Amino acid sequence: SAKREIANAFLVTDDDIIISDPEAEYSPLVERLGGQVIRVSPTSTQYINPMDINMNYSEEDNPIALKADFILSLCELVVGGKEGLQPIEKTVIDRCVHQVYQSYFNDPRPDNMPVLEDLYDELMKQDEKEAHHVATALEIYVKGSLNLFNHRTNVDIDNRLVCYDIKELGKQLKKIGMLIVQDQVWGRVTANREEGKSTRYYMDEMHLLLREDQTAAYSVEIWKRFRKWGGIP
């Protein structure tokens, strides 16, 4: 079973192990092994920041371009509806993502790490009505009752064994949570690659991320990179 495989990998290898856990079934094992369980829910005070980025985020010289792809996928889940994002919406999101990270990379300290609200504010400054449409759709995730992803990361995501318990996320939030966890895993893979370390990722219900075009394309691309960079799915 997956639990036995995880326990063996933990005891026999030095690999980092990350679990996306939609049914809260891995928490007892992870706690027994001294790992970190992160409960992602609208009522939790444990936060992961979807805007987290590190200098090694992409193998090309431009980590912002790959991060923009992730943010576009996130916005597709939030804004897209059946039609997905429209071309002008994609353009303004991409522009704003570049502006937000440009100012971060000018002074890349942890307390300058952008949050969703920085993207929201940047969208509101744009002239296009499409930018305001996207910002309005994001508002509930920034200032409203679903603002759990509008905080800086405040948990130990560097533990060798991390389990993201997303059971309490509702149907719509679950996909968003899975996408954000996938991005956190990618951040870990890129950091570990620098140290020559492998990263194992266990993920249930992957099919949920393959239903929207942009999100599916992004997820497939990330999984290809993941394997190339020493990830073990």
Model-found features: residue ranges?
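P-loop NTPase motor domains
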Residues: 24-36, 42-44, 49-231
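Glycine-rich phosphate-binding loop of nucleotide-binding enzymes
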Residues: 1-42
